[in-house]
């Protein structure tokens, strides 16, 4: 939970900040962020799309420069988006490994973070035979599970909101849950207080 998420003070509303969407690969983060943009009026920003637009496809970046180079690009993009006032009302989707970068993790501790939780049964049909995700090679199912187990604790620690994305829940349900949780957290009345205990959003 992010105890440092800024609260309103002196009766004034808290400054608008992006909502950062985290979770494992193939969870559907980008799809949910795009849905929130279309139906709730948020700006849509996707860290991977920013990187691809500037540097080319991610699999090629990994092949030519290695994972550390990609993580440095990723950290730079996250920091850039979070400090850009033009993205103050965005749903900002970041890659599955981004919260594992120490600099990114520290930034996210003071942001409103939503964790899209899924399981292997939900994700497996999306990644079977996928050759475009370098971190999942050569065995996508096994690698996904390994990465998820390694990263899950970090996701849970950072989350102000947890969304249950298992069983292929419709994106409309997830979006409605997310919007309700955002409204709840942004309307907290007490200055300097931590957010309420994160609630798992379920249909």
Give residue spans per PLM region.
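NTP-dependent small-molecule kinase module
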Residues: 2-14, 39, 153-203
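Hydrophobic anchor at the beta1->P-loop junction of P-loop NTPases
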Residues: 21
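P-loop (Walker A) phosphate-binding loop of NTP-binding proteins
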Residues: 24
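Conserved lysine of the Walker
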Residues: 29
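Hydrophobic positions on the alpha1 helix immediately C-terminal to the Walker A/P-loop
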Residues: 32
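Post-Walker A helix-loop "phosphate-sensing" segment adjacent to the P-loop in P-loop NTPases
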Residues: 38-47
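ATP-dependent small-molecule kinase phosphotransfer cores
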Residues: 46-107, 141
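A glycine- and Lys/Arg-enriched "phosphate-lid" helix/loop adjacent to the NTP-binding pocket
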Residues: 112-154
């Amino acid at each position: 939970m992010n105890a440092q998420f800024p609260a309103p003070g002196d009766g004034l509303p808290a400054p608008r900040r992006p909502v950062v969407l985290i979770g494992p690969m193939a969870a559907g983060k980008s799809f949910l962020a795009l849905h929130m943009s279309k139906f709730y009026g948020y700006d849509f920003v996707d860290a991977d799309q920013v990187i691809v637009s500037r540097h080319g496809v991610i699999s090629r970046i990994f092949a030519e420069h290695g994972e550390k180079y990609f993580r440095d690009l990723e950290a730079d993009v996250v920091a850039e988006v979070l400090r850009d006032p033009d993205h103050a009302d965005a749903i900002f989707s970041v890659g599955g490994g981004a919260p594992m970068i120490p600099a990114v993790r520290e930034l996210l501790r003071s942001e409103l973070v939503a964790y899209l939780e899924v399981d292997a049964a939900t994700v497996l049909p999306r990644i079977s035979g996928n050759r475009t995700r370098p971190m999942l090679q050569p065995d996508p199912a096994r690698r996904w599970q390994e990465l998820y187990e390694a990263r899950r604790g970090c996701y849970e620690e950072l989350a102000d909101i947890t969304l249950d994305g298992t069983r292929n829940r419709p994106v409309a349900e997830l979006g409605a849950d997310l919007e309700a949780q955002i409204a709840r957290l942004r309307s907290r009345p007490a200055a300097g207080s931590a957010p309420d205990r994160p609630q798992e959003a379920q249909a």
